[in-house]
């Protein structure tokens, strides 16, 4: 379920929307479509992680999470993964429970992988399909 967090205005509203979505049966909650700013931010994602954690403690049901929009670099993605591990634990470090909704991120991940192999960065155009 997409919450469009940029429209919710407060962390309390975000927490409530997350809880309502999970209680209504959502098996995955997503920050936004990525079209409305702000989209995924660290504080917004933490509020959602904490709501998921508390829901799991209460019900035993694992809910997935997808931060979308605004995550552009591999370094930013790593920060989200660390926060996920620290808040929800290893069980959520799987595509069944956590995914990035960030198309721009893919190019940076590819550039980082090429740099590891070739010791040189490539432009995003290097990865474009013909």
Write out the residue ranges for each language-model feature:
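Alpha/beta enzyme core
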Residues: 2-66, 72-100, 111-130
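Short, flexible loop segments at boundaries between secondary-structure elements
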Residues: 103-107
